[in-house]
Amino acid sequence: HAPFDHTGGVAELCAALPGVPVYLHPADAALVGGDVFPAVGAETTPYQDGDVVKLGKMDIEVLHTPAHTPGGVTLKVGDVLLTGDTLFQGSMGRTDFEGGSYAEIMASLGRLGRLSGDYHVLPGHMGASTLEQERKTNYYLREAMEG
């Protein structure tokens, strides 16, 4: 998503690896390069909920999980969820940034919590977990699933 802690090295990465695509949800693309978030430093390719991005032999499914920003996504790769700033080990992302929404993060958490099966959860910050562990112990995820 668009905040600098996730996009700050994109220009250097693209310089080192020309032709590597940079994906960004359109809801966050609208926020970059202005007063909210600095420019990403590379051309971006939009992706939407339900899209599947191919990376070698891997299929990466895009789940739109707005919360921290309106274009937040979770990437599902096999039995792994890359949850960005939506779901953390024992917590959730902040919603006090431009475009953040408590109601949206709760809906996004509910969506993740209701996925069938178990997944390894790799957030954008803090430690790794599993979805089953978070279903049992994460107050915010439990509230979202009940709501």
Where are these regions (language model features)?
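Histidine-centered active-site/metal-ligand motif
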Residues: 1-6, 25, 64, 68, ...
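Active-site HxH/HxHxD metal-binding segment of metal-dependent hydrolases
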Residues: 2-56, 139-143
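Metallo-beta-lactamase
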Residues: 31-39, 59-64, 69-147
